[in-house]
Curated annotation (Swiss-Prot):
EC category name: ligase
Catalytic activity, reaction form: (7R,8S)-7,8-diammoniononanoate + CO2 + ATP = (4R,5S)-dethiobiotin + ADP + phosphate + 3 H(+)
InterPro entries hit by this protein: DTB_synth_BioD, P-loop_NTPase
Compartment(s) of residence: Cytoplasm
Protein name listed in UniProt: ATP-dependent dethiobiotin synthetase BioD
Function: Catalyzes a mechanistically unusual reaction, the ATP-dependent insertion of CO2 between the N7 and N8 nitrogen atoms of 7,8-diaminopelargonic acid (DAPA, also called 7,8-diammoniononanoate) to form a ureido ring.
Alphabetized UniProt keyword annotations: ATP-binding, Biotin biosynthesis, Cytoplasm, Ligase, Magnesium, Metal-binding, Nucleotide-binding
GO cellular component, one term: cytosol
The protein's Enzyme Commission number: 6.3.3.3
BP term (GO), one: biotin biosynthetic process
Cofactor(s) it depends on: Mg(2+)
Residues annotated as the enzyme's active site: 35
Length: 221
């Protein structure tokens, strides 16, 4: 089964989360990574390749690759590229039963075009969703709004995964979000800083801490 990795906003941790899944289970489960729309060059795909050390065959080619770092609808307009959301939706629907990590661009309500939001693409594809959420001040409002948008569209939300640098509000943020939403808590991954992560640290420290109860692994088995 494919899983769509979405987030409450930009730079929340989707790419790190995707790296953790692929780095830990890519070889053993035969997982692939796919980012349908990439803005800002091919940075996320390259990040995953560098961190996981996996062969490029584990990384499917972007459907659309745009050099401007911005919302897909705006980046595509600047570069004269027409995003065919219907074709993209059909393609995602066709791979929904394959073992693929599908990473979205930006937050869930980011427009792909002037006519369709990312979340609508997820709904049309019928691929279940994991929501990556922040852990610091402001997380409650952001995350509950995102969950409400997902549930209003009757999308299969598998759970929430929290990523970020913790602060004094973190413990209560996670508790409050899970209590109010009723959505499954899949885990959390706390960072010490925003420093760029090396492959060595990722391989030794991060993979040993990730998904120790194998909750996420079971989605792909």
């Amino acid at each position: 089964m494919a899983v769509f990795i979405g987030a409450t906003g930009t730079d929340i941790g989707k790419t790190l989360f995707s790296s953790l899944i692929l780095g830990k289970y890519g070889k053993s489960l035969g997982l692939k990574y796919f980012k349908p729309v990439q803005t800002g060059n091919d940075s996320d795909r390259v990040t995953l390749m560098n961190l996981t050390g996996l062969h490029e065959s584990y990384f499917l080619k972007n459907y659309y690759s745009l050099s401007f770092a911005g919302s897909p609808h705006y980046a595509s307009e600047l570069e004269g590229v027409e995003i065919d959301s219907d074709e993209l939706s059909r393609h995602l629907y066709s791979i929904r039963d394959e073992k693929i990590i599908v990473e979205g661009a930006g937050g869930l309500l980011v427009p792909l075009t002037r006519k369709i939001l990312t979340l609508e693409l997820v709904r049309q594809s019928e691929i279940p969703l994991i929501l990556v959420a922040p852990v610091s001040l402001g997380a409650i409002n952001q995350t509950l709004l995102a969950i409400e948008a997902v549930q209003n569209r009757k999308i299969d939300l598998k759970g929430i995964y929290f990523i970020g640098i913790p602060d004094k509000t973190t413990e209560d943020n996670i508790r409050t979000i899970t209590e109010w939403s009723g959505v499954t808590l899949l885990g959390n991954f706390f960072l010490n800083s925003k420093e760029k992560m090396s492959r060595e640290r990722f391989q030794i420290e991060c993979l040993s801490r990730f998904d120790q109860c194998e909750v996420i692994k079971k989605m792909f088995v």
